[in-house]
């Protein structure tokens, strides 16, 4: 058997599927050489080991050549099997750092055999190294592999268009070299998986799911309406108009929500120069810019108010619409005097100046009777009092004086009663409340004999200091005078006894009603 010329640089492993010459008998070659050379069979087998062919399969041809004179390449070392891994070299370790790790057994075998990447010519496959060193972490062929569930892979349509249409995904498992349907006819061609010169990209880690998910995404995108798509893709807008007066009113009808040109349902700002015609502004939400225009002219307001004031019915309606605290007891009219704030909020107070003006006859045309009730004790009243005042310090005395024979107003004039004591703090206000209470009981609501009651603020002491000319005698005697201690004690006891008897009388009257 003659051996062909051996290459000077490296040895290679070929898988040739073309018709091969008939193999010579192995036994003849071994023993024939022994007879010729005079060597034993074991020695002859050792010498002629590299001259054997057809050992094991008809489609295999192994050529072993020695190239000790040249430096061996990184992928030149191989085992006799042909399907094992190469020994690691300096070039292989450098290439393994540059190429990304890929998954093993990610596609079915039939699809891998039919892939156009496996149908390259023999000349192209010789330009690239086939086998590489696989680390212990990469050697996962014998382990159970489970795909990770893709969350949402990015679509590959963008970068696939820029690639060569004949470029396909790399497959890094050398054990996947399987024949296609052409292997059944007997015409075999060398199958090698070349290394792509292009560096690893995102597609190297593709497991085949991206193509299926891309199709589903395209289908879902076609079914999604444009309005919904605009909600996902439109940017978030957050604006506030500089002028709040330009914003539309609360009850203005919004624009149709079906408009695809507007991402946010908002009415466009109006210009103040050209207001739109045919629009009607709600009166409940006036614009602050045109607030002055909506207010009627002052000349137009009295026309309606005067018509109401001209009739008694209109006057009563206007009075009833006002605050009840500003009306007298029967709600027929307002108070005649200007009142001031005092200790008791439920009572109306007048100042000493108003009292002096009444005494001077300033309101004589409006007042029929002006009654002043001095609620101090008799020794205080004798020491100095207001001209025309009546001293009534007992409640029963006030009731007999005012309610037994009530004063009836005539000609539309008023009957006014003013109460006071030394400071108008306790005795005067208490007497005023008592008269109003008894007057309510004796009349049908809201009618009253004395609807207009007042309390002099500051009492006699303040009035004496400001209006001494209206005091008679022009002097002031306090309640706690040292010369009238016994009188003070006597009147207090009498007032308390009467107050106790009053409470008993009220209790008896309630029991009778039961």
Curated annotation (Swiss-Prot):
The active site is at 421. One of its GO terms (molecular function) is phosphoprotein phosphatase activity. The keyword Hydrolase applies. Its EC number is 3.1.3.48. The modification Phosphothreonine is found at residue 497. Phosphorylated by CHEK1 on Ser-75, Ser-123, Ser-172, Ser-271, Ser-284 and Thr-497 during checkpoint mediated cell cycle arrest. Also phosphorylated by CHEK2 on Ser-123, Ser-271, and Ser-284 during checkpoint mediated cell cycle arrest. Phosphorylation on Ser-172 and Thr-497 creates binding sites for YWHAE/14-3-3 epsilon which inhibits CDC25A. Phosphorylation on Ser-75, Ser-123, Ser-172, Ser-271 and Ser-284 may also promote ubiquitin-dependent proteolysis of CDC25A by the SCF complex. Ubiquitinated by the anaphase promoting complex/cyclosome (APC/C) ubiquitin ligase complex that contains FZR1/CDH1 during G1 phase leading to its degradation by the proteasome. Ubiquitinated by a SCF complex containing BTRC and FBXW11 during S phase leading to its degradation by the proteasome. Deubiquitination by USP17L2/DUB3 leads to its stabilization. GO terms for biological process: cell division; G2/M transition of mitotic cell cycle; positive regulation of G2/M transition of mitotic cell cycle; response to radiation. Stimulated by B-type cyclins. Stimulated by PIM1-mediated phosphorylation. It holds the Pfam family M-inducer_phosp. Belongs to the MPI phosphatase family. Tyrosine protein phosphatase which functions as a dosage-dependent inducer of mitotic progression. Directly dephosphorylates CDK1 and stimulates its kinase activity. Also dephosphorylates CDK2 in complex with cyclin-E, in vitro. The phosphodegron motif mediates interaction with specific F-box proteins when phosphorylated. Putative phosphorylation sites at Ser-78 and Ser-81 appear to be essential for this interaction. This is M-phase inducer phosphatase 1. It comes from Mus musculus (Mouse).
